[in-house]
Amino acid sequence: MPKQIIIAEQHQIAAVFSEDQIQELVVATGHHQIGDIYLGVVENVLPGIDAAFVNIGDPERNGFIHVTDLGPLRLKRTAAAITELLAPQQKVLVQVMKEPTGTKGPRLTGNITLPGRYVVLMPYGRGVNLSRRIKSESERNRLRALAILIKPAGMGLLVRTEAEGKPEEAIIEDLEVLQKQWEAIQQEAQSTRAPALLNRDDDFIQRVLRDMYGADVNRIVVDSSTGLKRVKQYLQNWSGGQTPQGLLIDHHRDRSPILEYFRINAAIREALKPRVDLPSGGYIIIEPTEALTVIDVNSGSFTRSATARETVLWTNCEAATEIARQLRLRNIAGVIVVDFIDMESRRDQLQVLEHFNKALRADKARPQIAQLTELGLVELTRKRQGQNIYELFGDTCPACGGLGHTVRLPGETENRLPTPAAEVPERFVSLPTREPRLPTARTTEPRETYDGFGEAFENDSDLGALNLINHPSYQELNDNNKRRARTRRSRIGINGTNGKDEQRITANPLAFISESDLDLDGDVELSAPPELPTPNLGKSGWIERAERTKVIKTEPVKPVVEPPEIRTVEMTPEEQDIFALMGISPLIKLEQEVKNPKSVIINIVQPGQTPTIPTEITPEPVAKVTPSVEVNTPKVKLESKSVSVAATEPIKLTETMEESEVNAASTANRRRRRRSSASDSDTGEDS
C-alpha cells in the first residue's frame, strides 16, 4: 500500500501515513537517544547481578550494562566474571541500547553498531549477516558474496533489506561513509575526557529517510525549504544521482502548523486514551502496566452479523488489525497479553491467530506470538525501540499521582468539603451589637484555641462592642427561661462539668452574663467558656484538669466624657409638631455648625421669647445589676462610673417626649388639688 511521510523537523517528529491513518511515529527527543555513543566511566560493579553502572554524563541516573553486553571485553575472556572484566573508574566505550524509562537509566551495550542506508557496520562484530526479509535466494547469494569481499578486517557487517536490487557501487559507498565515521569516533575517544558524547544522529531528516523510506512511499512532506533540499539530496545520493520516479516531495506552505494540518496532534491525543473504537462498532481497551500491557476486545454495538459466531469472528479480526497498528503507533514493547472475545471453535481461533500474525509482519520491531493459553489469551512479545507514547507525550496527573483515581476514605468527606454558612449553629455565630458600648476589657493572656471548633476567639478589642442589655438572647428569655438557664449553669461543678453543657460553648465568652448580672458601679465578674475534656492514655482514660480556672486581670478604663454643647432654637408650636412628626432635628435651623451632633442640648423657645440656659446638668443614675453567675471559670473585673445620658445619647424631639411633658403637668396639677383639699379639711376641723 502507498505510504506518505510527514516530517516536522522543527519539532523533531515524523509520521508515516497509510490509508489516511498514522501507522508509526518517529520522535527524536530526550537527553539520551538510541544509537548515541558515549565514552563512560564505570561507577559501580555489582557481581551479584553480573552488571555495572556507568556514568555517561547524566547527574541523575547512571547507565546500566550487563555482562553479556560488554562486547570487546567479553570476547577476550568469555567465562570471566564481571569483576575481572570491569573495575571502578575504568573508561568504556558504550552505546545507548534502550532509552531511560521512569526511574531507570538507559540500557547500554559495548557492541557498537553504525547503521547506514544499505549496510550496518559492527566494529566489534564478526562475520556477515543478511536481512531475513530478502526472500530471493539468488539475491541473497549475490549480497553475501559482496559483503564478504568488502567487509573490513576484524569487523562484522549486516546487509539491510534496502540493499536488495541495489548496485554494488552504492553499497560500497555507503560502507566507506560508515568506516570514516568509526575512525572519527575512535580519535575523539582518545582525546576527550570522560564522560562525553562522541556520536549522535543529529540530522533528523537523514535518520527518518534511512529508517522509513522505501519503494512503497509515494509522497514526502517537509516543513521547511532547507529540509526539502536535503531530502532531495539524500534521495539522489542513494539512487545514483537521480530522483526516484513516482515520488512527490512537497514543502508545507499552509498557514496552519504541519502537525495540526495533517492531524498528527489529534492522533497523539487519541493514542493516549485507553479506548480505541473499531469500524464495526466494537472497541478495544489498552492498559499498560509495570509488568506487561493488557489489551481487551469487546463487541460493543456490533450486531450486523446473522449469528453470534460471525459477530465474534468479525470483531476479533478487526481487533487484530487495529492492535497491530496500535503497537507500532504507541511503540508498546515487552510482554503483551490480548484477551480476544471467547471463540468456541478451534478453527476460528486459528483463523484469528493467522490474521493477527499477518498484521504484525509490517512491524520492524519483530513481535513474536508466543502461545494461545487455555483461557483464550494471546501472549506475544515486542522488542523495545525507544520510548513509548506515554513516556514521550504523557505527564503524571498531579491530582491522583498517576493512579487514575483519587482516594476518598470513610469520614473524610465532611472534613474536605467546606461547611456552608447556613448550616453553622446559631450559638457559634457572633451576633451584631448595638450602642451604647461598655468599657473594653483587655486581658493579659492570649486566648486559647478550642479544638472542638478548630477556630480561636477574636481579639479582645471586640468585647467593647458588646451590648448585653439589648442582646437578643436576653430579650427572648422570660422569667421561666431565666430560672432554667440559672439551673443549667449551676450544674457545672468545681471538679467536673455536664457533658451537654460542656459542648454548648458560645463563641462569645460574655454571653453567659444576663441583664441582672451586670453591676456598673462595682466589679463585674465575666464567665469564660469551660474547657473541653482532653483524652489521656492512662488507666482511667481521662485525666483531671490541673488548672480549671484562670484569673484574667483587667485594669479599669475610664471613659473620657466631654460636656454637651447647648444650642437654642426658635420654633413655633406648629413647627415643633411638624419636626416631631417627621423626625427632623431642629439643628438644621442653626446657621453655625455643631461640633458633635450626638452630644448637644437643644433649648427650644418660641420666637421672641428669652431663652433659659441650664447651668448644671445632673446625671441620671443607671440601673444596677448584680452578677449571680456560678460558673467556675476565669473572671474579669470591670469598673465603670455612671455617665450622663446627655453625654452618650443625643436628645431627640419625638411625640413620646411631648406626651411625657403633658403627663408631668397633669401630675403636678393633681398634687396641688390634694394639698388644697388637705388644707381645707384642716381648717374645717379647727373651726
UniProtKB/Swiss-Prot annotation:
Record note on quaternary structure: May form homodimers or higher order multimers. Interacts with polynucleotide phosphorylase (PNPase, pnp) via the C4 Arg-rich motif (residues 670-678). A homotetramer formed by a dimer of dimers.
Signal peptide: none
SMART domains assigned to the protein according to its UniProt record, in alphabetical order: S1
Principal localisation: cytoplasm
Molecular function terms, GO-annotated: endonuclease activity; metal ion binding; RNA nuclease activity; rRNA binding; tRNA binding
Cofactor binding notes: Binds 1 Mg(2+) ion per subunit. Binds 2 Zn(2+) ions per homotetramer. Zinc ions are bound between subunits.
GO biological process, one term: rRNA processing
Compartments it resides in: Cytoplasm
Necessary cofactors: Mg(2+); Zn(2+)
Designated name of the protein: Ribonuclease E
Family affiliation: Belongs to the RNase E/G family.
Lineage of producing organism: Bacteria, Bacillati, Cyanobacteriota, Cyanophyceae, Nostocales
Cysteine pairs bridged by disulfides in the record: none
Domain S1 motif stretches: 35-117
Keyword Transcription regulation among UniProt keywords: no
Keywords: Cytoplasm, Endonuclease, Hydrolase, Magnesium, Metal-binding, Nuclease, RNA-binding, rRNA processing, rRNA-binding, tRNA processing, tRNA-binding, Zinc
Residue numbers spanned by region Disordered: 650-687
Gene behind the chain: rne
Top EC category: hydrolase
Cellular component GO terms held in the UniProt record: cytoplasm
Catalytic activity: Endonucleolytic cleavage of single-stranded RNA in A- and U-rich regions
Biological function: Endoribonuclease that plays a central role in rRNA and tRNA processing and mRNA decay. Has been shown to act on 9S rRNA (the precursor of 5S rRNA).
E.C. number(s) listed in UniProt: 3.1.26.12
Placement of sequence motif C4 Arg-rich motif, necessary and sufficient to confer PNPase binding on another protein: 670-678
